[in-house]
Swiss-Prot record:
Function: Probable RNA helicase required for axial polarization of the oocyte during early and mid oogenesis. Plays a central role in RNA interference (RNAi) process, a process that mediates mRNA destruction of translational repression. Required for the assembly of the RISC complex, a complex required for target RNA destruction or repression. May be required in the RISC assembly to unwind miRNAs, in the production of single-stranded miRNA from the double-stranded miRNA, a key step in RISC formation.
GO annotation, biological process: dorsal appendage formation; embryonic axis specification; germarium-derived egg chamber formation; long-term memory; microtubule organizing center organization; negative regulation of DNA damage checkpoint; nuclear-transcribed mRNA catabolic process, nonsense-mediated decay; oogenesis
Family: Belongs to the DNA2/NAM7 helicase family. SDE3 subfamily.
Subunit note: Forms a complex with piwi and fs(1)Yb; this interaction is required for proper piRNA loading and nuclear localization of piwi. The interaction of piwi and fs(1)Yb is likely to occur via armi.
Enzyme superclass (EC): hydrolase
Lineage, uppermost ranks: Eukaryota, Metazoa, Ecdysozoa, Arthropoda, Hexapoda
UniProt binding sites for ATP: G723, P724, P725, G726, S727, G728, K729, T730
GO MF annotation list: 5'-3' RNA helicase activity; ATP binding; ATP hydrolysis activity; piRNA binding; RNA binding; RNA helicase activity
EC number assigned by the record: 3.6.4.13
Catalytic activity: ATP + H2O = ADP + phosphate + H(+)
Protein's name according to its UniProt entry: Probable RNA helicase armi
Keywords attached to this entry: ATP-binding, Cytoplasm, Developmental protein, Helicase, Hydrolase, Nucleotide-binding, RNA-mediated gene silencing
């Protein structure tokens, strides 16, 4: 040892380095002092001049010194020292550095007092800790004296430590052992012991959990990834948390509950007072684990639905005893409840063959038989059951553990399989047995027909609605204005209507009770019933929204802090419906409080931001500042502002516009036209001046529509621009706007749309026209659009939000962002532009700004068919009856507005104002009166006919089926981009087929299977998923890009299955979505998956307008999206029952464009009746000039 130490006395280089380092430190200190003295002198001479220089120099000097200090005082060092003490599991180095002997790892047995060792330290704050004893540099002699050890310690004090940089990194691991205050974690760097008292964590770890450790690590260039030793573990998290996963209780043990084949929860993690039983449905926060057969562990649950011990499987088993419509009936007991462990009991069941042929029971399979308490006694061999006869099956139950379990078994017949379950409950006492029996009886009553989960959710919604507690309001997004020009009424839902909707057990009973209580529902809609009917329909829609919002409620939840906000994690928030938006609220309630108590209070949290998987809230300061991670019960509420605006409009519109506007029965001409223009050929003149068209590519029908609107000869009646798919509705609307602004100086126009995307499109088209200056028009947006960053950058400088505060009643706080977005504009800044574009309900913000009558002169709607009538009335109510004009542009034969309440939809709420008007006499088709305008009165309606979207062989389908065979194709079937693309893509079909060169519609017949998962009411068809995927691959091989393809299917489950197929195979995914997602869009190639293959399910679709079959509007949208090619995948035997689908299939058959399974007989019998040529679908054109 002394040989090693002596080196430090004979090393002149090392002494020289130490001297030079000391001189450097002294020089730096002296330089700093000299600088300070110089600054003091200059400051005394000229204090004003030196001020700025002084602060800059001091800052530079301080920065340089701090950098020097940091580099010299790294928290991780490698040092050399002498072991001065060893006592069991602890030791001391250099008399003052304590360490645990386990940090020596492999060399622990070689450690002795007097050894010179190299060790790694990590300093946090004032404390230095030995992380690892790396090696023994010099072993000690047995007769080494204490004096010699002290001398070696003194000599080593001059040894310069090696400094290492540190970094925070994540290390993944698996907990192998859980002790009282520590865990052992297996990592790729070896076993690591983590003291739980010294780290941050968000869950209680246990054996088998997969975890992520946030560690400070040593950066060592000796390793490839530069990671040396793990110095300190600071945080412990699960590798992943899946929040809000729906799980069903499958087994209940003494210490744990099984929530699925791979999921469990420890009973210690259950909320206090929660007792789970078989069949209970819970929302669980799951983490990854590796424990026995389980891969997921629930760390927190929220009970969602109590089933008291019965499951849908056991209910199915008991229901099977009725035998109604079943091939095999299973009768007998389906549960066994006892208080004895290791008891054996035989149970017998009877199997009845309900078919008219003999069945063979080949075997009985007990699922998971190694753990099951159920075993088969007889029959052990195959056995035949003749038609109408029965056999006995005997099982033995052997109770093996306390708790509840579902034992599954399968009856394997020669033609089918019958799955059944048996419930086994083992209790501790006979009293518990009696309680379990009561629970099972209650469960069967609860799951009886007529009390499904949807009806139970309504009962819960009623409880929430009836809970009246004091609410302490949260912090508003913007300051609530005390003075506004017009205050909207509250328009609360009547108590009696709420009681009917939320307490009726069956829908038919609900409808009957509503009609009895509100007798005007049985009368036709008229000016007398108008306000009452639509107010009721709005209330029904609000009630349904309230019920749907209960899906967000939680029995237990906690918040996390994020700056000035409290945040709440919500899994899959972006995909959930109804959506949460800024301004919605939630209320937090103490879960232990008595809801009936007068002292119970709740705090309101207002949503200020909505992110991908969490929301940011602000509460009253008394809650926000003191919150410390406690759990609360949460109830969510939507903002009623939109409903209130619609109620206000409905209550005023009758008085503002009158019966002639709402229920037109005749066309009355004005004394003078709105604008005295006239048409000569395709040119428009005002007086003797020719008016230039902004868009020179408009066809003659579009120009005529603009002319009719400008003249505005009809008195107080809406003008309808009827535009089939691809006919240029928006293009015509833009031209109308520009002509109104140029030729009517007093015009101030509102443009209303059903969605933000369509409002953005109108804004972009106006910008692209370059006909108006910035400031002539404005795009009114909501705060929700701003906060979610949903405004396209190219229109940002044209957008603004409004402030409803009365002018002069509050400080003007309008702000303009760097992008040009104007925020919080009061009436003096907004509402005075020539054109204001927004969604219908956002335009309703102007209702409270107090504009005088006649302030707005025109309201134009784009996609008016997708607006409900109350939404349409919101901007119209700001007009006056005289000298105003309303234009409705849309297609009533495409999808309607989305209405969540089925009852309201059935009562006409989903019918748009546009669609209702077309049933009135002035808008009806009369070819005899108006032969030159497709049979419509040009004073009130123009139907656009030229189709710019699709090849004739695609357009002809929806033209014939939905538009009286009147549409005129503009695209050439011989010389157009689409026709050349179609010609290139013919390679994806069978070469021997004699398909007409210009034919772009194809049908692929598949006898598939529609399936439905237990956790979703939506449907999917795996055979169609496969064929659609293979066709997409074939198109890619033909050099088609993903943005040229669209895949449409009516069911969300099929959408998910298709997306999973592309993601799982790492193939570029085209746009895949429902019909609603494709309305207003187009693609070169459209693939349609119809999904359904069951007649029984088709009957249900017809009732609820699901799928494509017998829902003409959905079919119309689906088949009108393609430009060059459309391929439909479906079951022709089922689709052909519908007349529209049969015509489409026949069209493909006659053009040799049908592939796949055999055709149904009804199509074969009829195919000779359908002409092969396309002329039956496309109007003949006399000259090519008509297309120009």
């Amino acid at each position: 040892m002394f040989t090693y130490v002596s080196k430090f006395f004979t090393n002149p280089d090392r002494n020289r380095e130490d001297i030079l380092e000391s001189l450097d430190r002294e020089n730096s200190f002296l330089d700093q002092k000299l600088m300070e003295e110089k600054m003091d002198q200059q400051l005394k001479a000229n204090p004003n001049e030196i001020n700025g220089v002084l602060s800059n120099k001091i800052a530079e000097l301080t920065h340089g010194l701090s950098e020097m200090d940091v580099s010299k005082e790294s928290s991780c060092t490698a040092r050399k020292g002498v072991i001065t003490s060893l006592d069991g599991d602890r030791g001391v180095i250099d008399k003052d550095v304590l360490f645990e002997t386990k940090v020596a790892e492999d060399i622990i047995l070689d450690l002795h007092v007097g050894c010179v060792v190299e060790y790694l330290t990590f300093t946090t704050g004032e404390a230095m800790r030995v992380v690892k004893v790396k090696s023994i540099l010099e072993h000690s002699w047995e007769d080494t004296s204490q004096k010699e050890i002290e001398k070696a310690v003194d000599n080593l004090k001059n040894e310069k430590p090696t400094f290492f940089n540190t970094e925070t990194r994540s290390v993944l691991g698996l907990i192998s052992q859980r002790l009282a205050s520590s865990i052992d974690v297996e990592t790729e760097y070896g076993q690591l012991t983590v003291e739980l008292d010294n780290i941050e964590m968000n869950f209680i770890p246990t054996n088998g959990d997969r975890v992520r450790l946030e560690c400070n690590i040593q950066l060592d260039d000796g390793f490839v990834d530069k990671q040396g030793e793990i110095l300190e573990v600071t945080k412990l998290f699960p590798t992943r948390i899946q929040e809000g996963e729906k799980c069903i209780v499958e087994r209940v043990y003494v210490h744990m509950v099984v929530l699925g084949p791979e999921t469990y929860i420890l009973k210690t993690d259950l909320p206090t007072g929660t007792d789970l039983h078989l069949g209970d449905i819970v929302l669980a926060d799951l983490i990854e684990c590796q424990y026995s057969k389980f891969t997921r562990r629930a760390i927190k649950i929220t009970p969602l639905e109590k089933n008291f011990g019965a499951t849908k499987l056991t209910q199915q088993s008991s229901m099977g005893s009725s035998g109604s419509g079943k091939a095999v009936t299973v009768t007998g007991v389906n549960r066994f409840i006892t208080a004895e462990l290791w008891q054996k009991e035989s149970v017998s069941l009877k199997l009845t063959n309900n078919l008219n042929r003999t069945l063979r029971l080949e075997s009985i399979t007990v699922c998971n038989d190694s753990e099951s308490q159920l075993s088969v006694v007889s029959p052990l061999e195959s056995k035949e059951i003749s038609s109408g006869s029965e056999i006995t099956v005997t099982f033995e139950i052997h109770t093996q553990f306390l708790g509840e379990a579902i034992e599954k078994y399968v009856l394997n017949f020669d033609l089918l399989k019958v799955r059944r379950v048996f419930t086994v409950i083992v209790c501790k006492t006979k009293e518990e047995v009696a309680e379990a029996e009561k629970r099972m009886i209650a469960a069967e009553a609860l799951m009886a027909p007529g009390r499904n989960s949807q009806e139970r959710s309504r009962f819960y919604a009623n409880q929430v609605w009836c809970n009246k507690v004091d609410v302490i309001p949260g912090q508003q997004i913007v300051t609530k204005r005390r003075f506004v020009a017009l205050r909207l009424g509250c328009f609360e839902v009547p108590k009696e209507l709420r009681q009917i909707c939320l307490t009726s057990e069956r829908r038919q009973e609900m409808i009957k009770a509503i009609e009895q209580h509100y007798s005007f529902l049985t009368e036709p809609l008229s000016i007398k019933t108008y306000m009452h009917r639509f107010r009721l329909l709005l209330h029904l829609e609000e009630i349904e929204c309230f019920v749907n919002f209960r899906n967000y409620d939680r029995d237990r939840a906690h918040f996390l802090r994020d700056g000035e906000f409290l945040t709440l994690q919500i899994e899959n928030l972006a995909e959930r419906r109804p959506s949460l938006v800024i301004g919605d609220t939630l209320r937090v309630i103490n879960p232990w409080s008595d809801p009936d108590s007068q002292t119970t209070k709740s705090y309101e949290g207002i949503i200020h931001k909505v992110l991908f998987d969490r929301i940011l809230l602000k509460f009253h300061s008394s809650f926000q500042e003191k919150y410390n991670g406690e759990d609360y019960r949460l109830e969510f509420y939507f903002s009623r502002y939109s409903f209130r605006k619609q109620h206000h409009a409905i209550s005023k519109i009758v008085g503002v516009m009158g019966e002639d506007f709402l229920f037109p029965s005749k066309v009355t001409k004005r004394e003078n036209p709105q604008l005295d223009v006239y048409m000569k050929d395709d040119d428009m003149y005002l007086y003797d001046s020719k008016l230039e068209w902004y868009n020179q590519s408009l066809n003659s029908i579009q120009k005529r529509a603009v002319f009719n609107i400008l003249r505005g000869e009809a008195e107080n009646i809406p003008y309808v621009l009827f535009g089939p798919p691809g006919s240029g509705k928006t293009m015509t609307l833009i031209e109308t706007l520009l002509q109104l602004v140029r030729n009517l100086p007093g015009a101030r126009i509102l443009v209303g749309t059903p969605s933000n995307s369509s409002a953005d499109l109108v804004t972009k088209r106006l910008i692209d026209s370059k006909a108006l200056l910035q400031g002539d028009f404005i795009r009114l947006v909501s705060y929700n659009q701003v906060e979610k960053d949903l405004i396209p950058p190219e229109i940002m400088s044209y957008c603004a939000t409004s402030d409803v505060g009365a002018v002069g009643s509050c400080e003007d706080k309008m702000m303009v962002t760097e992008s040009g977005l104007k925020l919080r504009c009061q009436a003096k800044f907004i509402g005075t532009h020539r054109i204001t574009i927004s969604t219908c309900t956002t335009l309703g913000n102007f209702l409270q700004l107090g504009f005088p009558a006649g302030h707005f002169t025109h309201v134009l709607f784009d996609e008016a068919g997708q607006c409900t009538e109350p939404e349409t009335m919101v901007p119209i109510v700001m007009l006056t009856k005289k000298r105003s004009q309303v234009v409705l542009s849309g297609d009533p034969r495409q999808l309607q507005s989305i209405v969540t309440s089925r009852i309201a939809s059935k009562m006409g709420f989903s019918i748009s104002f546009l669609e209702r008007l077309l049933e009135r006499s002035p808008y009806r088709k009369d070819l005899q009166r108006f032969p030159e305008s497709s049979g419509y009165n040009p004073l009130v309606l123009t139907k656009l006919l030229y189709n710019y979207r699709a090849l004739p062989s695609i357009m002809s389908i929806y033209s014939r089926l939905f538009y009286d065979d009147e549409l005129i194709p503009v695209l050439s079937e011989k010389d157009s981009r689409e026709s050349r693309l179609l010609s290139k893509l013919r390679c994806v079909f069978e070469s021997e087929k004699d398909i007409p060169q210009a034919h772009g519609t194809f049908f692929y017949g598949i006898i598939g299977e529609n399936r439905q998962n237990n956790d979703s009411p939506s449907w999917f068809n795996p055979q169609e998923v496969r064929e659609v995927f293979l066709m997409t691959i074939a198109l890619y091989r033909a050099n088609v890009t993903a943005d040229q393809i669209g895949i449409i299917t009516p069911y969300q489950k099929q959408v998910k299955m298709l997306r999973s197929m592309f993601i799982g195979t790492d193939v570029v995914m085209p746009k895949i979505g429902s019909v609603e997602e494709f309305q207003g869009q187009e693609r070169d190639i459209i693939l349609i998956s119809t999904v359904r293959s069951s007649e029984e399910i088709l009957r249900m679709d017809a009732r609820f307008s699901l799928g494509f079959v017998r829902c003409s509007k959905r079919l119309n949208v689906a088949v009108s999206r393609a430009r060059a090619m459309m391929i439909i995948f479906g079951n022709p035997h089922l689709l052909a029952v519908d007349e529209c689908w049969r015509q489409l299939i026949l069209f493909c058959v006659k053009n040799n464009a049908y592939f796949g399974c055999d055709l149904p007989q009804m199509v074969i019998n009829q195919k000779d009746e359908v002409p092969v040529c396309l002329e039956t679908f496309v109007p003949s054109l006399n000259t090519t000039d008509d297309l120009n």
